[in-house]
Curated annotation (Swiss-Prot):
It comes from Drosophila melanogaster. One of its GO terms (molecular function) is transforming growth factor beta receptor binding. One of its GO terms (biological process) is regulation of neurotransmitter secretion. This is Protein 60A. The gene is gbb. InterPro entries: Cystine-knot_cytokine, TGF-b_C, TGF-b_propeptide, TGF-beta-rel, TGFb_CS. The lineage of its organism: Eukaryota, Metazoa, Ecdysozoa, Arthropoda, Hexapoda. Disruption phenotype: Flies exhibit transparent larvae, and a reduction of the adult wing size.
């Protein structure tokens, strides 16, 4: 198969993914065992060796950067960001990083049981059966309910507690009232679920015993007809005096109301009382509940799980925006052919059967390591090769493809051979900074080829 045909098939894969033609300039088509160390186009020289075909120019990299930003749904790259090492010490980014690692490790393997209290429920739980990935301090960082929500959502956003000029403390006790800025949530996102996470450290409390049970309740703060505060209960969770770890409370109804009417966002209030004394509120500090003045890694935070609109836009739409950008940012290109910009070579290899090849896009080469946290690059892979008779078992051929191959042998001019195409696709999670306060995790479905076959 010729280098030209291999590249054409790679273009077809990229076009089907909505990435556009220009992203081809940023891929490395290498066998899985080979790692590209420089951005450019790599080809097989016919001797099972991968060689550099063309180095990316600065203009190429600029085009690629525009394409990836549009692909991520971001108007422009974030600037003036703190280092990952500093930002990832905070509780909310650490949660998303944990989610990212779980998605990459378990993609395609998470079949969750039904949960009656999943969407917009009023009951929350502690999920004490979760394994302790980072020791006792990070108990229940990712719960079974989270795993279900992760599977159902495309976008996961975290919100750290912030001080708002219109938010006063209630009942003169610091730490009970929290406020989250949700103004960055796009209007076309559908809310699947929202959770509040607060950290309990029994070693900091008064009652270090399992015999003392407490109920933690979270309320949405509203404004009554006379301008007075109202409190609508959202959910509750029971805990004990000796518990150390994260508590999870469902706040879906609260976040939904704030997204519909932003002026109604007056924050939430956290109440606590002994199970046997519901009429008497206890201090949060007495049961070791951590409030907003503690270390970054134990700060309370809110998680929003969303279903976004189609995240990968049509190629035609992408091309339209590229044309507009070209008009507003004209760049002169050299017309002469240089060693780094030559036509694709003629075929140097024999025809190969349908198989998976490596297609790699390196984010780090664009200088985006300061805002894209993970991954460093995009290993998409693509399907390439012929579907010739006989179709072997490793070609994953459908019954129809087998029949079509036989008919092609009889009528080669009337019936084409089956096509080499993906048979299984996986998701690509991307973790990135919006700014110093917000980190997003987007999951792009059907972005990574897992296997190929003849169809």
């Amino acid at each position: 198969m010729s280098g030209l045909r291999n590249t054409s098939e790679a273009v077809a894969v990229l076009a089907s993914l909505g990435l556009g033609m220009v992203l081809l300039m940023f891929v490395a088509t290498t066998p899985p065992a080979v790692e590209a160390t420089q951005s450019g186009i790599y080809i097989d020289n016919g001797k099972d060796q991968t060689i550099m075909h063309r180095v990316l120019s600065e203009d190429d990299k600029l085009d690629v950067s525009y394409e990836i930003l549009e692909f991520l749904g971001i108007a422009e790259r974030p600037t003036h960001l703190s280092s990952h090492q500093l930002s990832l010490r905070k509780s909310a980014p650490k949660f998303l990083l944990d989610v990212y690692h779980r998605i990459t490790a378990e993609e395609g393997l998470s079949d969750q049981d039904e949960d009656d209290d999943y969407e917009r429920g009023h009951r929350s739980r502690r999920s004490a059966d979760l394994e302790e990935d980072e020791g006792e301090q990070q108990k229940n960082f990712i719960t079974d309910l989270d795993k279900r929500a992760i599977d159902e959502s495309d976008i996961i956003m975290t919100f750290l507690n912030k001080r708002h000029h219109n938010v006063d403390e209630l009942r003169h006790e610091h730490g009970r009232r929290l406020w989250f800025d949700v103004s960055n949530v796009p209007n076309d996102n559908y809310l699947v679920m929202a959770e509040l996470r607060i950290y309990q450290n029994a070693n900091e409390g008064k009652w270090l015993t399992a015999n003392r049970e407490f109920t933690i309740t979270v309320y949405a703060i509203g404004t009554g007809t006379l301008g007075q505060h109202t409190m609508e209960p959202l959910s509750s969770v029971n805990t004990t005096g000796d518990y150390v770890g994260w508590l999870e409370l469902n706040v879906t109804e609260g976040l939904h109301e704030w997204l519909v009417k932003s002026k109604d966002n007056h924050g939430i209030y956290i109440g606590a009382h002994a199970v046997n004394r519901p009429d008497r509120e206890v201090k949060l500090d007495d049961i070791g509940l951590i409030h907003r003045k503690v270390d970054d890694e134990f700060q309370p935070f809110m998680i929003g799980f969303f279903r976004g609109p189609e995240l990968i836009k049509a190629t035609a739409h992408s091309s339209h925006h590229r044309s507009k950008r070209s008009a507003s940012h004209p760049r002169k290109r050299k017309k002469s052919v240089s060693p780094n910009n030559v036509p694709l070579l003629e075929p140097m290899e024999s025809t190969r059967s349908c198989q998976m090849q490596t297609l790699y896009i390196d984010f780090k080469d664009l200088g985006w390591h300061d805002w894209i946290i993970a991954p460093e690059g995009y290993g998409a892979f693509y399907c390439s090769g012929e579907c010739n008779f006989p179709l072997n078992a490793h070609m994953n051929a459908t019954n129809h493809a087998i029949v079509q191959t036989l008919v092609h042998l009889l009528e080669p001019k009337k019936v084409p051979k089956p096509c080499c195409a993906p048979t299984r696709l996986g998701a690509l999670p991307v973790l990135y900074h919006l700014n110093d306060e917000n980190v997003n995790l987007k999951k792009y479905r059907n972005m990574i080829v897992k296997s190929c076959g003849c169809h």
